[in-house]
Amino acid sequence: MNVAIVGATGYGGIQAVNLLKNNKNYKISFLGGNKTSGSKWNDNFPFIYLDTDPYIEKISVENISKNSDVALLCLPNGISSTLTRKLLDRGVKVIDLSADYRYKSLVEWEKVYSKEAVAFKRNDDDLCKEAVYGLPEINKEAISNGRLISCPGCYPTSALIPLVPYLSQGIIENEGIVIDSKSGTSGGGREPNQKLLLSECGEGLSAYGLINHRHTSEIEQVASLISGNKIELLFTPHLVPISRGMHSTIYGRLRDPGLTSDDCRILLDNYYRNFKNITVLPVGTFPSTKWVKNTNQIFLSVKVDIRNGRIVILSVIDNLLKGQTGQAIQNLNIMSGFSMDDGLELTNNFP
């Protein structure tokens, strides 16, 4: 199967090339990047060497579609929407890593991504409704039948995977959910950003996007769908001075305050026992971002505060892999009829 990587020179695209270059199921048919178009891949990224040393090409529907079955769109918010319909019309399936199709309503997207809505005059509400939310652990069947997959954001991935088992079974209350997340600097992308300079963020920790971070509504949309009730929650992201990795701590109130840590761990373990990339830790073992660096793995831990009937769930992911491109490859595998984790048997080089 021929795969186009559009936006190949950003962090997401670079990860995609690295994951697909030796994958027997796929052939990289196109590498797109406007700023570096006309130059050879190996000159730009000698550390991800490609035997064919292809040219990086200008991004256009014609260039993408001429030899491709699927396009991975690793692009800033808004740009994917200018390409998607035309690619679909040419028979190219689309896996979008931006937020353009994460909402079932274009109106909702325009509320959350208001700056992009001004810059990109969209008229594709039908595609918003068609797009499948690409969280493989909860949406595998729909992904397998889809032609447009919208990959979740990194924060929503780290929050929803721990939450879904408890929301879907009514274990926790719909009100009072709090998500506290920390992310490495690569989550901000590869474009220059003063806040991500080493001298600005090194040896420090800071919150950002307080109350109104864009991923809040994305988490709420999926959580509400899973629970069958409208959910409003509190989400606070933080920037930590590591290159990659994400740690989320989720707090909720148990409907049955008699449930123990062991009860909640068993429930979590049973829910994800068939997923190779998810490890549910013993009660009292708490995960570190170091454990998942450069892998598509997720580590989960849960503990109950019996004094007040609250549950605390921890999750760690690599924000560039399970939080972005690794998850896109899972979706690609499912769409293509392969095992979900093919090509993602990645080993952590601890420490």
Curated annotation (Swiss-Prot):
Gene3D superfamilies: Dihydrodipicolinate Reductase, domain 2, NAD(P)-binding Rossmann-like Domain. Its EC number is 1.2.1.38. The active site is at residue 154. It comes from the Bacteria. The gene is argC. Its main location: cytoplasm. The lineage of its organism: Bacteria, Bacillati, Cyanobacteriota, Cyanophyceae, Synechococcales. Keywords: Amino-acid biosynthesis, Arginine biosynthesis, Cytoplasm, NADP, Oxidoreductase. SUPFAM superfamilies: Glyceraldehyde-3-phosphate dehydrogenase-like, C-terminal domain, NAD(P)-binding Rossmann-fold domains. This is N-acetyl-gamma-glutamyl-phosphate reductase. The keyword Protein biosynthesis does not apply. The keyword Oxidoreductase applies. It is an enzyme of class 1 (oxidoreductase).
